[in-house]
């Protein structure tokens, strides 16, 4: 055999790779990284421009301390690079077009690139655009026949230049995912209604800081929707006047907002999991505060407003529920009645030292089939209205939500984050009162193994527990200890 035929160098191996494999390899790289491979050989010179996914990331965005002249030069180079790649590509189909650009990238160029990819029947647009002036998003995007996923983010948020969406006709027959982050909807509720009505197969909707608190009414009603995420920052405390959710196919609901004055309709017939981050709303009181004569400015009294009752009724068939600490407060002050959650099997409660557990006794009593209870931290505001939830209240005349609890698995996260002693007493309280408990997992936030040993020994010293068959584990990143509880029962 000719030995020369066996002498295949690395360059020959690279050149001999099938084009399909080359495109597959390049698909794991950003377009900028893929462009570097054009130096490997003449054959690879233009492959980078024909990968199915194009990913452009403005380098200035990652270097905020750059000088003005250098920043301008890099922006010009970046824009030339994007133009060159799209020109090389010609009419070749684009699967995904991802663009992240900061202030200084010409908005006219951004629009040109977006419209170019639309002509290439792009399936997915992922756009993160910062602008120090108002940028009007091209409305042609909303009549695309090819888009399956659309993500639009204003990188500056709502504090600086705005990314404004103004839709005319909307027809997105293939769109399944719509993600809007910090964008401004022109004509507000009309724009949102037109946009959603043109998405006939939409399955996932994410709205981040698309503030609707000042609209007369707000509605997210889509019959095909399966996942809905709505989030507004904590600073927006004006309650929305009226909110409607009519999503019979929804299985996942994540909602963080000031609780509305009224929930006109909440239809979640198929809901499986919900995460609620409701906040108490405030409005100026009708009763002004009397101030002394000559006081330099008027004092304004604010009153709690909002009603979460109908929203809670709408999610009552949920199986998995996560409540942020602010929601626990809303249940205390802005919910007339907590519904019965017959299907709920897993409940997670986030704790906060500023929020009491007043609403938890009624909540737990209304979860007759709850199997797993999770606490994200145990420290909370001490009050005299938390029943037997914690040892801060004298034992007489209290509601027995723990002693009648069906919970079998209790998980405590962030243990030891603030006050080990208080959290240990709370944990002992759970063990002494929960009769059906089979497993307690304590996730200790510590890097010191001796802390786990100490807590484990203290748990073993409990005089009696409500459930003799309960197994306890104390877990950290480095160690897991099993605790043997006393066999005698205190009940």
Swiss-Prot record:
SMART domains documented for this protein: FBD, FBOX
LRR repeats by residue range: 127-154, 156-182, 184-209, 325-351, 352-377, 419-444, 472-491
Keyword Repeat on entry: yes
UniProt entry keywords in alphabetical sequence: Leucine-rich repeat, Repeat
Residues covered by the F-box domain: 11-57
Matching Gene3D superfamilies: 1.20.1280.50, Ribonuclease Inhibitor
CDD domains given in the database record: F-box_AtFBL13-like (cd22160)
InterPro entries in UniProt: F-box-like_dom_sf (IPR036047), F-box_AtFBL13-like (IPR053781), F-box_dom (IPR001810), FBD (IPR006566), FBL60-like (IPR055294), LRR_dom_sf (IPR032675), LRR_FXL15/At3g58940/PEG3-like (IPR055411)
Pfam families on file: F-box (PF00646), LRR_At5g56370 (PF24758)
Protein name: Putative F-box/LRR-repeat protein At3g59230
Organism listed in the record: Arabidopsis thaliana (Mouse-ear cress)
Source organism phylogeny: Eukaryota, Viridiplantae, Streptophyta, Embryophyta, Tracheophyta
């Amino acid at each position: 055999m000719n030995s020369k035929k066996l002498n295949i160098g690395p360059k020959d191996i690279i050149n001999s790779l099938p084009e399909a494999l080359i495109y597959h390899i390049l698909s794991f790289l950003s377009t900028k990284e893929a462009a570097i491979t054009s130096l490997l050989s003449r054959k690879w010179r233009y492959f980078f421009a024909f990968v199915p996914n194009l990913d452009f990331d403005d380098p200035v965005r990652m270097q905020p301390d750059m000088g003005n002249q250098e920043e301008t030069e890099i922006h010009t180079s970046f824009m030339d690079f994007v133009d060159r790649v799209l020109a090389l590509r010609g009419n070749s189909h684009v699967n995904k077009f991802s663009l992240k650009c900061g202030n200084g990238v010409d908005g006219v160029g951004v629009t040109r690139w977006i419209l170019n990819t639309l002509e290439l029947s792009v399936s997915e647009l992922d756009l993160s655009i910062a602008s120090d002036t108002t940028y009007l998003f091209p409305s042609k995007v909303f009549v695309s026949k090819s888009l399956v996923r659309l993500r639009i983010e204003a990188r500056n948020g709502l504090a600086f230049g705005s990314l404004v969406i103004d839709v005319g006709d909307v027809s997105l027959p293939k769109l399944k995912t719509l993600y809007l982050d910090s964008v401004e909807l022109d004509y507000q509720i009309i724009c949102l209604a037109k946009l959603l009505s043109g998405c006939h197969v939409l399955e996932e909707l994410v709205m981040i800081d698309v503030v609707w608190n000042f609209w007369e009414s707000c509605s997210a009603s889509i019959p095909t929707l399966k996942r809905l995420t709505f989030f507004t920052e904590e600073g927006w405390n004006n309650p929305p006047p009226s909110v409607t959710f009519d999503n019979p196919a929804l299985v996942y609901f994540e909602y963080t907002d000031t609780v509305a004055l009224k929930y006109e309709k909440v239809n979640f017939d198929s809901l499986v999991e919900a995460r609620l981050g409701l906040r108490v709303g405030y409005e100026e009181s009708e009763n002004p505060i009397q101030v002394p004569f000559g006081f330099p400015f008027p004092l304004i009294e604010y009153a709690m407003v909002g009603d979460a009752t109908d929203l809670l009724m709408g999610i009552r068939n949920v199986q998995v529920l996560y409540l942020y600490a602010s929601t626990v407060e809303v249940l205390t002050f802005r919910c007339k009645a907590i519904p019965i959650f017959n299907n709920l099997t897993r409940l997670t409660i986030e704790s906060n030292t500023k929020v009491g557990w007043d609403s938890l006794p009624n909540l737990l009593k209304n979860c007759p089939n709850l199997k797993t209870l999770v606490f994200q931290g145990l420290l909370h505001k001490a009050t005299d209205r938390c029943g037997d939830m914690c040892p801060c209240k004298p034992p007489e005349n209290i509601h027995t939500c723990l002693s009648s609890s069906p919970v079998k698995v209790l998980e405590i996260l962030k243990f030891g984050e603030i006050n080990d002693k208080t959290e240990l007493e709370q944990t002992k309280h759970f063990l002494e009162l929960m009769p059906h408990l089979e497993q307690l997992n304590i996730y200790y936030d510590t890097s010191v193994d001796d802390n786990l040993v100490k807590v484990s020994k203290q748990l073993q010293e409990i005089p009696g527990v409500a459930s003799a068959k309960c197994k306890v584990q104390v877990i950290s990143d480095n160690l897991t200890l099993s605790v043997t509880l006393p066999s005698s029962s205190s009940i």
